Amino acid sequence: MDLTASAAIVLSAAGRTGHEAIIERAGAIVSPDLLEDAAEAIAAPWVSTGGGLLTPGCSGWPRGLADLGPAEPCALWVRGTPSVELSRMVAIVGSRRCTPYGRDCARILAETVVGTGRAVVSGGASGIDAAAHHGALAAGGATVLYAAGGAGTVYPENHRGLYHAAQASGAVVWEFPPGSALSGRSFLHRNRLLAASSGA
């Protein structure tokens, strides 16, 4: 037996070719029931502690995420007020190392946005993001914090109070399930959701 043979050669030798053969074989290895059981095992603790799980097409799903096409997430892990309309948001994002003037501008802009009845969405980072969240909160409006990493991750750690305030006024949203590692790429994934959900 040639252990260096390609997958196409192996499938061809078995009398099958093309994508259908690969899908059929994958289905035999991982059954839909097994995947469903695994998903329920991950989601159950989250939901039992007050977390929510949104999927495309359900109430509250940000409409703009459909513009991502195949990169649209399959679920969003949420903590916060269920009444927040996640499809009526304006994104305010910027530098972590901003000037006091930039911080003031972000805060004032956020106050203006919530005055129009929309929620402010940002990424919870230091600098402009935090100023935007705080501006929305100070004006009595809703803010939605798109967080990087797995559901429940707070980064930076000293923003735990901001996460709780965002959760109380609006929502904190993660793309990945609890336990997913936080890495540099996590922020890129998060940023595409910020842009798409606000129609940027």
How should these model regions be labeled?
Residues 1-3, 53-200:
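Glycine-biased, small-residue-rich flexible motifs in mid-sequence functional cores and linkers
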